[in-house]
Amino acid sequence: DELIRAGGTVDVAAGTAPDADDVAQGHLQAERALDFAACIGCGACVAACPNGAAALFAGAKLAHLSLMPQGRIERGRRARAMTRELDALFGPCSEYGECVPACPAGIPIEAIALLNREVLRAGLRGATRDD
């Protein structure tokens, strides 16, 4: 719940951002985003991890939202906020991959790589940018 409150949703008013239906979204990218959206937040990945990490869950949420036009608006803020909560509430990712076979939704380990990419991207862009 804390991770979702920290950034697991699209919270900003889009303002002048184009409507999602107006933005051409490639079929493969949309399918990829929907694959990550399959995460049900059950916690099986956390239970399977020897460190109690929630990196697969957080990665699935960040990947899903950053791949869709609606979620790109606040992707930097979301990555920073979610990783702050992730670090405070869960153990570090062991990178052993025990979480993947435990996931009933079939979220791939690529979600953890995408989590790391979003965090790095947000850090390189600085605390003042959200894109």
Tell what function each PLM region has.
Residues E2-A38, C42-D131:
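Ferredoxin-type iron-sulfur electron-transfer modules in oxidoreductases and energy-metabolism complexes
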